[in-house]
Amino acid sequence: MKLKGTKTEANLMAAFAGESQACVKYQYYASKAKKDGYVQIGELFEETSRNEKEHAKIWFKLLHDGMPGTAENLLDAANGENFEWTDMYAGFAQTAREEGLDEIAALFEGVAAIERAHEERYRRLLANVQDGLVFSRDGDQIWQCSNCGH
């Protein structure tokens, strides 16, 4: 499918962004509704959030001609995190400082540090996938079952 550069590609990207934001926003709304004692409303927000997640997945898969592989996803995630900490949040922090909003600038800088750690983690995981070290290691290792904890 030839989407590159089309208005439809832009529409798919906007649809993906909108559905993704709605998914997360409705999770926040669900949490607040439940804290306020509105369990049924919270559950409705959770259900709708799951719906929005699936809608986002439709648009994502069309944009990427299916679901990319794990190595490709790790590289994409690492590159995205790199952009966030080196460019996006650095720029946001600078703007906030210029506007006298030092507390917000500090928050941007703090999140940038977390994004840097995310990038490093994704790059280590990608190296493990590429080197065949996800399920095996040299020497003695302790493995823990992610289901039962044993």
Set out the residue ranges of the language-model regions.
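Non-heme di-metal
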Residues: M1-H150
